[in-house]
Amino acid sequence: MTIPKMKLTTLSIFALLFTIGCQQNGEKTAAKTTETTTKTTATTKKNILFFGNSLTAGYGLDDASTAGFVGLTQQKIDSLNLPYRCINAGLSGETTAGGNSRIEWVIEQQPVDIFVLELGGNDALRGLKAEESKKNLQGILDKVRTKYPSVKIILSGMEAPRNMGKTYTTAFHNVYLTLAKRNNIALIPFVLEGVGGIAELNQKDGIHPTAEGNKIIAETIWKVLSSLL
C-alpha cells in the first residue's frame, strides 16, 4: 500500500515531536533526580560546631577559613569523604562568661551533632577565678545538652601561664579534668600541645598560633574527633 506524501509527512513530524518530547521528559527527570540527590547530600551532612575564642576564630591568619584548625579539620573530613560540615563559631576575646551568654543564640542557628568547646584561655590570661570558669563552662555544656540531648562533646583543655603561680595553674588545669569526668565527655588535655610557648609556631604576640601551629592543633584535635565520626 502506498501512503500519500502529505500523510507521510504528518506521520514523520508526529514521530519527531514524540521523540523530542520523550528526550525532554528524560532530561527533566534526570535533572530532577540530580537536584534531589544534591539536596539529600547537603541535608544529610552532620554539623560539627567549634565554639571558642580567637584560637578557634583563626586570629591573625591570612585566611582563617583554610589555614585555621577548623578549616584544616574540614579539609581532612572532605578528603575522607565523611558526611560532616565544620562550623566556626569562634569569637576573638571571648571569655567563658561571654561564651555562656552567647551559646544559646549560636545553637539556635543550626542543628549540632558534635560540639567542640574551646574556651578558658582569656580567663587565665586575666587571672579570673578558676571556679568561675568551671561554672561558666558547665553552663555552656548544660545548654548544649538540653537543646541537643544526643550531641557528642569534646572539651579542649587549656593551661594557665606559669607566671600565675602553681596554685592557680593547678586549679585551672583541674577545671577541664573535672568537667570531662563529670559530664562524661571527650577531653583534649591541652589543645596547644606542641605549639604553646614555641616561638616559631606562634605569631609575634606569642599567643596566637601561626599557620604551621594550626596544623599541629588540627592534628591534636583530630586524634580525639576522629573517634566520634
Q: What role is predicted for each listed range?
A:
Residues 1-10:
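Bacterial N-terminal signal peptides that target proteins for export
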Residues 24:
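Short, conserved catalytic or interaction motifs in soluble domains
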Residues 18-21:
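C-terminal motif of bacterial Sec signal peptides marking the signal peptidase cleavage site
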Residues 75, 100-229:
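Alpha-helical cap/lid subdomain in secreted, periplasmic
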Residues 55-62, 90-94, 122-124, 159-165:
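Short histidine/acidic/glycine/proline-rich micro-motifs that form metal-
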Residues 28-92, 102-110:
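Serine-esterase "nucleophile elbow" of acetyl-processing enzymes
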